[in-house]
Amino acid sequence: MFTLKKSLLLLFFLGTINLSLCEQERDADEEERRDDDEMDVEVEKRFLPLFLPKIICAITKKC
């Protein structure tokens, strides 16, 4: 009975450590994805002001 309790306690402990490591990796992956998304937004912000006047000029033909 005592060895069974030790084995179960060891499995629970190792499972808890494994779960916490997986959560840390998942959090790190999510942070990397957020960085890429933020970079895309910055590129879009820089792209739009450069070409918006040219697009409006081409549509209205008032240059």
Swiss-Prot record:
Provide the free-text tissue specificity comment from this protein's UniProt record: Expressed by the skin glands.
Instruction: List cystine links.
Output: C57-C63
Question: Which species?
Answer: Amolops mantzorum
Q: What does this protein do?
A: Antimicrobial peptide. Active against some Gram-negative and a variety of Gram-positive bacterial strains. Active against fungus C.glabrata 090902 but not against C.neoformans 201211. Shows hemolytic activity against human erythrocytes.
Signal peptide, first to last residue: 1-22
**Which InterPro entries did the record assign?**
Antimicrobial_frog_1, Frog_antimicrobial_propeptide
Question: Which compartment or compartments is the protein found in?
Answer: Secreted
Task: Give the record's keywords alphabetically.
Answer: Amphibian defense peptide, Antibiotic, Antimicrobial, Cleavage on pair of basic residues, Cytolysis, Disulfide bond, Fungicide, Hemolysis, Secreted, Signal
- Give yes or no: UniProt keyword Coiled coil: no
Supply the residue numbers of the propeptide(s) excised during maturation. Answer: 23-44
* Recorded GO CC terms: extracellular region
Q: Establish whether keyword Zinc-finger is in the entry.
A: no
What is the name listed in the Swiss-Prot or TrEMBL entry for this protein? Jingdongin-1-MT1
Family statement: Belongs to the frog skin active peptide (FSAP) family. Brevinin subfamily.
Q: Name one GO biological process term.
A: defense response to fungus
Q: What is its main location?
A: secreted
